[in-house]
Amino acid sequence: MLIIFISFFDRLLLILLIASKMTNTLASITYEDDITIITLDDGKVNAFSYEMLTQVHRLLDQVPQKSGALIIKGRNGIFSGGFDLKTLASGDLSKITKMIESGYNLILKLYSFDRPIIAAVSGHAIALGLFVACCSDYRIAIDGKYICHANEVRNNMAITDQIMEILKERVNKKYFYSAIYHADPFSVKDAIDVGYIDEVISEDRFMERVNEKAKELASLPHPFYANTKKIAQKERRKKISVSIKKYQIQTSILRAILKLKFW
């Protein structure tokens, strides 16, 4: 009787463990020949919480660095809604700064990635979600009533140096005021002129075109792609790295001050 009970308990524990892992999977990785696909899917708006960012960082470490190409895609209707608003509104300085720092590091990692990246913009791309797409070599959006929106200014936030360096390179000067300073949203089709998106493809051909472009860019030889990119991005990478370091120092000082007790 005891053996049966233990066996039942073990099976129940295993089921709960599997269910827990399934629930906590916010990003996944698959491989198709020389193409790696990272899929963002939190079941909601693909908010970049600290947990999702941590998972994406780990998955990026599993992507081949000397061959192939990487596709980053979202779930149906949403690429990503940006940083997790619940964390930002929590008032927990430690959680907020950890999440933001991880987001900045993700931007630098993607921007300087040694292999080509294709962003499969499967829906709305907002704030950090849009900036992640902007770090990619090529951005293909699904056709539909979706927007690309750097909405920081309209949400009482300033776009920081770490992000601005990417936007300076990507956004068409003609649209810089409206897209960045005025925080105007753009349809995915209009986002082509802005510089956010390269192509808009109908839903029935979306992933076919994404895979086609990924295979094309996967043929770029190593290390010549990576070395050329490194030379071109040298100053911008340095500026982003310095800005991240400055953020780390500032937030560590702030946390230390808040821990002090004044009597």
Regions found by a protein language model. Give the residues of each.
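Glycine- (often His-adjacent) and acidic-residue-rich active-site loop
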Residues: 54, 66, 74-105
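Structural motif
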Residues: 73, 120-121
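Intrinsically disordered, low-complexity segments enriched in small/flexible residues
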Residues: 231, 235-263
